[in-house]
Amino acid sequence: MKTVFTLLLLAVSLASQAGRIITDSVESKVLGEKVLYNIYLPNGFDRNSKLYPVVYLLHGLSDDYRAWRDKGRMQDVADELIESGEACEMIIVMPNAGGPDTHNTWNGYFNMPGWNYEDFFFQEFVPAVEMKYHAVGDKGHRAVMGLSMGGGGSTVYCQRHPDMFSSCYAMSAWLDNQNNNVGVGQEKDKRYYVSEAVKEHSALRFVEQADDETKKQLRTVKWFFDCGDDDFLFDQSVWLHQLMRNARIKDELRIRNGVHNWEYWHLALRMALPFASRNFE
């Protein structure tokens, strides 16, 4: 009986230390629709008026804003890391940028015909979320990370907006599509357009063509690329790492055993959140 009582007390204690995830939305004039997002709020968020650093956590192609909560179990990971002191208290924002029917639903973080998502993200989404959920709201307290399409989106966002983010953690990142890595056909549906947008916003070509001033700005961001050794996008992370080294832009590259799946990304998140935390000012 004493053991059962002790376990119950422990369960109550852990529950009282947990953060929570809520679903919210932003009405976008740029996209002409309501954009849903999930946001993780750390324990005690409602009991104080402090300002928090923020992480934008991006999903992959064919997923949506629920993926990191439901498949990645990010609340468990965040609660554990914050409680242990491995990560600081932070808010984590998971915006919607797609859906499972990739041929008929817009997916992607870049501007493309009919879907100016990058404009929405920086002009509408970030200001609205950070105002409502009292984020610190500066480069030193803002990070972006994501998997696959979201890993590529995170990388390119930091390349194109280095004044906005302190760090980028890209998991199994879709960084380029010169070789049609996602197997898109010639039919010009919505999957075709996201494929073309990734090609046009190649993170590899961006570094290859960067001038000295651009490289200087890229050095103000902390970079981490994490990809499985059997991932079909493996070569892209390795290639970008080499380009960064050639340009004297410091980055971290981790190649671990794994493929393009949630088992890999769940473990990656355990490294990504402390990485972001260490690089907040």
Regions found by a protein language model. Give the residues of each.
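Non-catalytic cap/lid and distal C-terminal segments of serine-dependent acyl enzymes
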Residues: 19-281
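Sec-dependent signal peptide recognition
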Residues: 1-9
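Absolute protein N-terminus
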Residues: 1, 18-19
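Hydrophobic h-region of N-terminal signal peptides that target proteins for export
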Residues: 8-17
